[in-house]
Amino acid sequence: MSTIGSFEGFQAVSLKQEGDDQPSETDHLSMEEEDPMPRQISRQSSVTESTLYPNPYHQPYISRKYFATRPGAIETAMEDLKGHVAETSGETIQGFWLLTKIDHWNNEKERILLVTDKTLLICKYDFIMLSCVQLQRIPLSAVYRICLGKFTFPGMSLDKRQGEGLRIYWGSPEEQSLLSRWNPWSTEVPYATFTEHPMKYTSEKFLEICKLSGFMSKLVPAIQNAHKNSTGSGRGKKLMVLTEPILIETYTGLMSFIGNRNKLGYSLARGSIGF
């Protein structure tokens, strides 16, 4: 009687995919009776293969869900905003960027940013209807501090985000009213927080306009020049660029949890709904 755990009498076979009727060369073990040496079993590669999951934004069917990446969409937005700046102020545009704004309630919002020689423009652009919905103008001479760093949250916060961003201050947060601080739709917040757009790696074009480093390289000199040329209260100011954690004061975070996971802040194809 053979002992328990003995594998005598068993023959190793390789797994084959369904429909493969031809035996492979490794299906049978070499069994030469005259060979005095122990039988050698060659190692076979596993039937399942482990591969690194690719960046989802490299896949066209995912990137096309974002209307900003569709052919001609970002170019149309830039031309619209160029025309608006030419008609209203005539200022010189330093560059365009497509970034994600994170509001004081941790909600993500897709935004186009323009830096001119005097102004930072934050545009809410509808990439579906190809029209500017909202435009916020911030004088560069009013910006006095920029913070770069990782996002941090209160210890009890339920909806935390990873990654890094930047925050631009043109007013004191201490002077912000309690009402505007707790109002998720308030437009009186004296700062703006940004991070890179999720479509950054879609193409070389989007890699260029979605990078925070590229945005900073144009924004900082423009602010410094605006301070030098300012004739008002901003004259003589010095811009502070700090590396420190960026605090987002959200505690429950249910609203941002639902909105961010469903990408409600982006012009996105939501799919068809039928019966």
Swiss-Prot record:
Tissue specificity of this protein: Expressed in the epidermal layer of the skin.
Keyword Cell cycle: no
Residue intervals of the hSac2 domain: 68-240
Keywords from the named record: Cytoplasm
Transmembrane feature ranges: none
Chain spans, region Disordered: 1-54
Signal peptide positions on this chain: none
Gene Ontology cellular component annotations, sorted alphabetically: cytoplasm
InterPro entries attached to this UniProt entry: hSac2 (IPR034753), Inositol_phosphatase (IPR022158), TPRG1-like (IPR040242)
Pfam families in the cross-refs: hSac2
Main location: cytoplasm
Subcellular location: Cytoplasm
UniProt superkingdom: Eukaryota
Keyword Cell membrane among record annotations: no
Biased composition (Polar residues): 41-53
Family recorded in the similarity comment: Belongs to the TPRG1 family.
UniProt protein name: Tumor protein p63-regulated gene 1 protein
Native species: Homo sapiens (Human)
Encoding gene, per UniProt annotation: TPRG1
